Structure formats: C-alpha cells, structure tokens
C-alpha cells in the first residue's frame, strides 16, 4: 500500500510534468530523438510531388498505374535514465533539493518517451548500483520509475559514475538514449575551500581521467546526454563568520572562517575550475550536456537543449 504522502507527491509531479510535456515539450522530444531507421508501411498510387525513387515498378507494371512504396520511421526507442542518488544530491540552498529536481526531470523525460511509445528504464546509483528497472512502456511503469527516484533510500553515500556507465553497457543490448542525471561531484572533492587550490585541481584531473574513458565508451554505444545538477551555494560562500562544512558523501567536516575574503575567493575559483573541467570533459568525448540549477526554472535549459539539437540535425 502506497503511503498517502507518497501518493500525493507522485500525483503532483505527474500532473505538473505531464502538463509541461503537453504545453512545452510537445513535438520537441519526437523531432530531436529519431528512431533507428525506417520500415515499409504500404503501397499507394503515385501522386504529383512524390519522389520518383520510391516507385514500386513491379506493382506499377502489374496495375498499369504508377505506385510508390511508403515508408514510416521505425519509432520505438529505448530511453535509459541514470540518476545519481548519492548524499551530495540531497542538498539545496534555494527552492528544491537536487534530488527532487532529478525526480521532476526524470518524470518529464519519461512522460515524453511514453507519449512517443518508447520504452523507459532506470538505473539509480551511488558508489554502487542501487536499483535497476528494465525498460518498459506505459503510464503505470513511468509512475513506478518516478516513485523510486523520489523515495528510494540508497545504501551507498558517495558517487561512482564510471561503475554506473559500465553497468549500463552490460544491461542494454541496443543503442539507447541515455540521460545521466548527477551533480558530477567527484567523491572527496566537495570540501576544498583551501587557499592553495593546487591539490584541488590535481584531484579533479585524476577524477576526470577515470571518468573520461567510461563516458567515451558509453557515448559510442549510446546517445548520452549529461544533465548536471547545480546549486548557487556550491559556487559562492557567504560571509557568515566561523562555520562548519560537511562533505555529505564522506562525512568529513572542516571548520572555516567564511569572513576571510581570500578564502571565499579561492572557494569560488576552485568551483569555477571544477565546472570548466567538467565542460571540457563532456566536449572531449562528444557528450551533450544540460546545466540545471536549483535557483532557475529547469524548463528553460531543457527547451534550449532541444532547440540546439534540432538545429544541429538540420
């Protein structure tokens, strides 16, 4: 029996996101993500303007009238949604938690997919694979996916995207559309406000190289789109005096003086470098990405992504 609170929350997301799919994303998903080919539909009489290359000469000869072969897009796709459920995603300084944001984005993608008769699957991960839901169709299946993303309690705390991508390649037998939703925080690098940022950059370089290989392999097999979850407090420290910061994934804490202007400046520089390296990583392996922040409506970023992909395919 589903708890009343859970049912209401799933229902709210269903109403909100399905409305967005109808009003904002109608046609966008279909035009951007095409099927794997075409399949024969029917033979009909030739009409002015038809491509002469599609004429079926056997039927034309038999009937004495020109006929053409009509083909339709082989529409069915498999959409895999990979969601980072590590503890760093249970954070926000404004609006909603990154985990809540992930659930709503997953819902929009899932509803868009089933509206186009595509299959939807889910992989939730931390430093291990927490749950795998095989791809299926239908509203009931999508509601199950949303319910899991919203209320699943992970066993792991930290993040291992490489392991999630390797698991994806094991359980998928055909080319899929893959949405990888994560804050892309390498474990152990969340707390780095030190004035000397050299160790921080070295840690990022090491994590990037580990992830780069797995992401490149996955992107060759699938169409991978990274969706990054961000929060403004991860970029700027406020002047609040002596404060304690805790890394949600490792549990480590650090006591800092946030009134130190040099430290706040270094904190901002470190995180600016983190975002730049993340962008370089995606570009180096040809992975599209969408930056989502807790303080800005996510619909704008997703609409811009669809428009960019559509222009590129022309």
Spell out what each predicted region is.
Residues 1-136, 177-182, 187-188, 235, ...:
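An amphipathic, basic-hydrophobic helix/alpha-beta surface used to engage anionic
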Residues 1-32, 38, 42, 170-174, ...:
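Von Willebrand factor type A / integrin I
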Residues 66-68, 164-167, 211-213:
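A generic local structural motif
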Residues 89, 93, 149-153, 286-289:
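Short amphipathic alpha-helical interaction patches enriched in hydrophobic/aromatic residues
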Residues 103, 157-161, 207-208, 271:
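A conditional alpha-helix N-cap/helix-loop micro-motif detector
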Residues 105, 163-167, 274:
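Well-ordered alpha-helical segments embedded in enzymatic catalytic cores
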Residues 133-147, 307:
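Short, electropositive alpha-helical surface patch
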Residues 141-176, 188-190, 205, 231-232:
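Von Willebrand factor
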């Amino acid at each position: 029996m589903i708890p009343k609170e859970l049912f209401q929350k799933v229902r709210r997301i269903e109403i909100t996101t399905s409305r967005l799919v109808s009003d904002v994303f109608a046609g966008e998903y279909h035009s951007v993500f095409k099927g794997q080919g075409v399949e024969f539909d029917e033979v009909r009489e030739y009409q002015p303007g038809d491509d002469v290359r599609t004429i079926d000469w056997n039927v034309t000869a038999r009937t004495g009238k020109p006929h053409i072969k009509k083909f339709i897009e082989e529409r069915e796709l498999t959409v895999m949604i990979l969601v980072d459920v590590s503890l760093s995603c249970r954070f926000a300084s404004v609006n909603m938690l990154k985990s809540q944001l992930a659930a709503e984005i997953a819902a929009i993608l899932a509803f868009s997919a089933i509206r186009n008769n595509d299959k939807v699957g889910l992989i939730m991960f931390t430093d291990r694979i927490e749950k795998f839901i095989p791809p299926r169709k239908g509203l009931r299946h999508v509601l199950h996916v949303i319910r899991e993303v919203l209320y699943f309690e992970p066993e792991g705390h930290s993040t291992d995207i490489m392991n999630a991508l390797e698991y994806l390649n094991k359980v998928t037998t055909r080319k899929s559309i893959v949405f990888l939703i994560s804050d892309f925080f390498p474990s152990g690098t969340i707390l780095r406000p030190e004035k000397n940022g050299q160790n921080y950059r070295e840690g990022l370089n090491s994590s990037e190289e580990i992830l780069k290989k797995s992401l490149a392999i996955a992107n060759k097999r699938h169409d991978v789109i990274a969706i990054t979850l961000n929060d403004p407090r991860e970029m700027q420290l406020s002047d609040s005096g002596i404060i304690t910061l805790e890394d949600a994934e490792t549990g480590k804490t650090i006591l800092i003086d946030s009134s130190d202007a040099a430290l706040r400046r270094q904190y901002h520089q470190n995180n600016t470098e983190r975002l730049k390296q993340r962008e370089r990583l995606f570009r180096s392996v040809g992975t599209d990405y969408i930056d989502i922040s807790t303080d800005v409506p996510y619909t704008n970023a997703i609409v811009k992504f669809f428009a960019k992909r559509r222009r590129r395919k022309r």
